[in-house]
């Protein structure tokens, strides 16, 4: 059954043409090849490691993104397509209950088979079929649906490119050898010191939030709606390691008065003393584990790999708060959306380079926690069919992050993009900036 999904597309319906098909075919090859580039540094043994229930093995990621194209597009819209292996529908379905049962998330790391070679063959099989399907002539409305779904599949794959880097980093950190994902020297942009932390004032008022118009957006970014903002101030850059270090040295992790109750319980149970990946040696010197290996902690880089609880506690400690997602988006629409993204190749945040905008560093480097719970926008409706499970069913017990990170593809992010994680998670590249009331 054909459904017209509510996905904002690149052009109006009457402009869909061979140009769009060519564009999508080129983008398909580019995105799929980028995933293969990301796994090139890995050894065979790295592909099946799952160091915690939060992460997935790299092999599972490259198979799951392929399954998405096979199950959501080829099996639905190509009568001539032959499924590569029917068992893969169980192995590589992530969480789509409407499609059927699936391998439990915490057991993805037990799948020594299919082999990496098998999964690469699976990708090649599906890639050829998708490109063939795209180039076939058909009724315009059906072609539009297929093109929209291919675009969504590519956006989904870009999310998993970031997840591959997140998960590999965590897997390697649990290894006593602390191996580096990449050993090449990467020139990092940025200055030796971050600019001083100041605040920019905004009058607020009645503003519009959400996505509409041309360009892709997920269903959780719409519809556009009104939001009232009281006057507020927003920090001109994210909080740095130097500033967060002051919180640590002041005993912030031991002082319950700064923490939400659930947050302090997590801190106590898991014995947090610093952000994830920070390491202190016997001489009291700090280092940090990165995808480039262990490096000295650079104090002027944005603090990264902190949970919502840590970001919130720090904000309370210094008499500020986190911005709401509406405040963040309102400002984010007004600034340059360039930043330190995956394409730069360092896979690590760097100090804010430019201080020539009212607010800097909102895009790239680190995802920024907001004070907003992940919830549907007014009058929002999930997509039809299985894709209705993509976002809507996770709108509980999660907090919103904005802006993208150093492992996010640059053409994947926008001011309206809503990322989300449970408040205790911190293996994602998450930081924060301060806000305040006026």
Residue ranges of predicted features:
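Disulfide-stabilized, aromatic/cysteine-rich ligand-recognition loop
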Residues: 5-56, 60-129, 133-136, 143, ...
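Functional-site microenvironments in short loops/helix caps that host divalent-cation chemistry
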Residues: 153, 157-159, 163, 167-190, ...
